């Protein structure tokens, strides 16, 4: 058994050097790092030891043939030429893992099929029974790697991938692979025999892997099925010796210095069961708790805090995550002075919310996600800085002090005015500072942060970090609960994308505006159901509507209709192309106890409806989109190009003393006064009168006009 054979251990990208060190320690192998793994030369006993003890390897492969192929015929000939009868019995099932392509073999499925054909044909030509393919529980797994013309055919000695330790029956959301968890621990700097705390432990993988390391429990000690069980070269006696030695190496006399916390008691129950399955239940203390109340379970010792907190791809929403990471950083500095911390995250920007300086960092993949692990020393200096920060109001404003100061100033001015006005939905910040290109709106006790799309010349990562900083500052300055802060990315509208649904939460609540109650939805659509900049326009329309027949075109959710009806309009007619928003308008009418018999709703293309309308109206409010090319409309619409065409139709249904209130959001809009005059209409620009205090910093957000018949 002293024959030296070169095997290949596969690993996740970035872990190759760590795996090399591990294999050298496990079986004193001669190792050579390659992309995606390590070639290691050892005895068969050494290979068994690697299979049993490696925490980082994904698979251990025994190369059978290394050759060059240029076509599928070359591939087939190579496979048929292997003496499979010396490797496994045809009565055993097999499966083919095929990785890689070249010019002739362009997909892995085809490559696997040709390998399967070659294996089956080999046995049939030798007069053996045809072996069966089993995808899920194969006795033998054949691994083929193809890189251009270079091909390696191997026997997979692992069977199932080695990250499948067998102890994890069930998981919470977004679990870590055990091999990744082991790598995180090894990179964390944690020393065996010192405390290890995971404040958001989930299903417990990090703590279980670390506890097994300290207890000397081989990660595959309880695995029953191996890829070598049906291999004819398997040495059962040697394997038995390796297994017995692994049992003897276990250290049962160690202190229980592992502590897991999680807010979810159901996930914690799964973690406890996983620990029992892994044989380390007696080493880990579990406790349900919020990270905001985290306390050091071993204040008299120095240890390591290790954690894989939630991030955007995993759980939660960004505002909640910013708050979570911020409070986590505070608790680390409060409770773990002198300790080390190692935090792994799929959103590196969130790690900045910890407000700690890292001394080492590592890149890694968690599935398709690019992740970052940062190591910190929680020094006395960091703790002192934290305590000093808490004496100042600016403790969170330090994140984005200019933004926080401006937001605070705006709040003092605007909220007093809003209370006097009788409104509880208004804008607090609107890209006042160019480096914080976003808007902050209040809807009663909710806050909406809308990020405007950054210019192409702005670094995406820098823009993302500024957004996170601004959200963090907004949470602190406003005092809003994290679950009541909504974050949106607003881009330049194209066509009718304001109608596209973003979510399906169905969370509606109403806000008040000059006596009107209006439903809003902050999560499901790009817009909320209420254009805040048109607040004074709606108020004015309501005052003008008393005793008049009122038409609301491009009505959106009908908020102007509500003001008109509440102020005594003789009748209202509301037109919009979207059934969703028309239903919303109906709900607004019901909320204000306004009967449908006097307030009609029609779903229609507004321009087409106008062309067919035979009624006349005394007051018309029209707020068309800047541009639209909806499939429901016969032609595209451009407000600059087509507004005279629209006025031509409106004049026809306007009473002799009637008024059109025309508004749009096109910056730089130019009214065609000559075209209006030819129609016998005149326009007065009242934009400055319809700009509320909370939008005075953005005077071009809309333009508004009063249009009448020219007096004879």
Curated annotation (Swiss-Prot):
Entry-linked InterPro entries: 23SrRNA_methyltr_KL, DNA_methylase_N6_adenine_CS, RlmKL-like_Mtase, RlmKL-like_Mtase_CS, RlmL_1st, SAM-dep_methyl-trfase, SAM-dependent_MTases_sf, THUMP_dom
Which top-rank group of organisms is this from? Answer: Bacteria
Q: Decide whether keyword S-adenosyl-L-methionine is in the record.
A: yes
In this protein, which residues make up the domain named THUMP? 46-157
> What keywords are assigned to this protein?
Cytoplasm, Methyltransferase, RNA-binding, rRNA processing, S-adenosyl-L-methionine, Transferase
Please name the Pfam families in this protein's record. Answer: Methyltrans_SAM, RlmL_1st, THUMP, UPF0020
Entry EC no(s): 2.1.1.173, 2.1.1.264
| Top EC class of this enzyme | transferase
Question: CDD domains attached here?
Answer: AdoMet_MTases, THUMP_AdoMetMT
Q: Which GO terms describe its molecular function?
A: 23S rRNA (guanine(2445)-N(2))-methyltransferase activity; RNA binding; rRNA (guanine-N7-)-methyltransferase activity
Q: What is its subcellular localisation?
A: Cytoplasm
Location, primary (coarse class)? cytoplasm
Answer yes or no on keyword Acyltransferase: no
Chain coiled-coil ranges: none
Catalysed reaction per UniProt?
guanosine(2445) in 23S rRNA + S-adenosyl-L-methionine = N(2)-methylguanosine(2445) in 23S rRNA + S-adenosyl-L-homocysteine + H(+); guanosine(2069) in 23S rRNA + S-adenosyl-L-methionine = N(2)-methylguanosine(2069) in 23S rRNA + S-adenosyl-L-homocysteine + H(+)
Question: Function of this protein?
Answer: Specifically methylates the guanine in position 2445 (m2G2445) and the guanine in position 2069 (m7G2069) of 23S rRNA.
Q: Which family does it belong to?
A: Belongs to the methyltransferase superfamily. RlmKL family.
Name-wise, this protein is Ribosomal RNA large subunit methyltransferase K/L
Which organism does this record belong to? Actinobacillus pleuropneumoniae serotype 7 (strain AP76)
């Amino acid at each position: 058994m002293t024959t030296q054979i070169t095997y290949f251990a596969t690993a996740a990208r970035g872990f190759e050097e760590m795996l090399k060190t591990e294999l050298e320690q496990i079986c004193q192998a001669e190792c050579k790092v390659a992309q995606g793994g390590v070639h290691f030369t050892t005895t068969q006993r050494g290979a068994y030891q690697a299979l049993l003890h490696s925490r980082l390897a994904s698979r251990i492969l025994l190369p059978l043939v290394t050759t060059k192929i240029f076509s599928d015929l070359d591939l087939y000939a190579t496979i048929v030429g292997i003496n499979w009868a010396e490797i496994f019995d045809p009565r055993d099932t097999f499966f083919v893992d095929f990785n890689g392509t070249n010019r002739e073999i362009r997909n892995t499925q085809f490559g696997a099929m040709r390998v399967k054909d070659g294996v089956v044909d080999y046995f049939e030509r030798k007069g053996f029974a045809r072996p069966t393919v089993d995808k899920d529980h194969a006795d033998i797994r054949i691994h083929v790697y193809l890189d251009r013309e270079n091909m390696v055919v191997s026997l997979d000695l692992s069977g199932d991938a080695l990250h499948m330790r067998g102890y994890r029956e069930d998981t919470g959301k977004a679990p870590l692979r055990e091999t990744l968890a082991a790598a995180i621990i090894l990179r964390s700097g944690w020393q065996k025999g010192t405390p290890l705390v995971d404040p958001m432990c989930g299903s417990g993988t990090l703590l279980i892997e670390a506890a097994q390391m300290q207890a000397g429990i081989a990660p595959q000690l309880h695995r029953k099925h191996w890829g070598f069980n049906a291999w004819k070269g398997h040495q059962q006696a040697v394997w038995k010796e390796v297994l017995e030695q692994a049992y003897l190496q276990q250290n049962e006399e160690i202190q229980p210095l592992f502590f897991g916390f999680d807010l979810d008691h159901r996930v914690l129950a799964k973690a406890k069961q996983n620990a029992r399955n892994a044989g380390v239940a007696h080493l880990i203390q579990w406790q349900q708790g919020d990270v905001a109340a985290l306390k050091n379970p071993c204040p008299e010792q120095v240890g390591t805090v290790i954690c894989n907190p939630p991030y955007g791809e995993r759980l939660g929403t960004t505002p909640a995550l910013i708050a979570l990471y911020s409070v986590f950083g505070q608790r680390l500095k409060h409770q773990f002075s002198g300790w080390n911390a190692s935090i792994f995250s799929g959103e590196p920007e969130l790690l900045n919310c910890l407000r700690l300086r890292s001394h080492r960092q590592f890149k890694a993949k968690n599935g398709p996600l690019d992740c970052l692990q940062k190591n910190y020393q929680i020094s006395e200096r960091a703790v002192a800085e934290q305590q000093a920060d808490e004496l100042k109001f600016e403790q969170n404003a330090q994140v984005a002090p200019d933004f926080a100061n401006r937001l605070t100033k705006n709040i003092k001015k605007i909220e007093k005015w809003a209370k006097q006005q009788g409104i509880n939905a208004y804008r607090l910040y609107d890209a006042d500072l160019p480096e914080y290109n976003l808007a902050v709106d209040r809807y009663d006790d909710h806050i909406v942060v809308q990020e405007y799309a950054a210019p192409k010349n702005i670094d995406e990562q820098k823009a993302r970090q500024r957004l996170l900083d601004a959200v963090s500052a907004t949470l602190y300055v406003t005092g809003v609960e994290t679950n009541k802060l909504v974050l949106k990315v607003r881009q330049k509208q194209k066509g009718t994308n304001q109608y596209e649904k973003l979510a399906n939460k169905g969370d509606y609540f109403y806000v008040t505006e000059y006596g009107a109650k209006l439903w809003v939805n902050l999560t499901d659509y790009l817009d909320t159901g209420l254009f805040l900049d048109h607040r004074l326009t709606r108020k004015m329309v309501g005052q003008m509507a008393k005793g008049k027949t009122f038409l609301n075109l491009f009505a959106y959710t009908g908020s102007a209709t509500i003001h008109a009806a509440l102020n005594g309009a003789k009748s209202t007619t509301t037109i919009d192309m979207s059934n969703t928003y028309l239903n919303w308008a109906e709900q607004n009418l019901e909320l204000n106890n306004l009967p449908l018999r006097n307030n009609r709703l029609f779903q229609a293309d507004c321009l087409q409806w106008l062309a067919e309308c035979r009624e006349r109206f005394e007051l018309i409010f029209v707020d068309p989109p800047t541009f639209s090319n909806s499939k429901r409309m016969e032609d595209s619409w451009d407000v600059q190009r087509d507004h005279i065409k629209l006025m031509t139709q409106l004049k026809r249904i306007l009473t002799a003393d009637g008024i059109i209130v025309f508004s749009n959001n096109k910056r730089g809009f130019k009214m065609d006064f000559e075209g209006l005059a030819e129609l016998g209409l005149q326009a007065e620009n009242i934009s400055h009168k319809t700009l509320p205090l909370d939008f005075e910093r953005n005077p071009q957000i809309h333009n508004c006009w009063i249009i009448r018949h020219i007096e004879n």
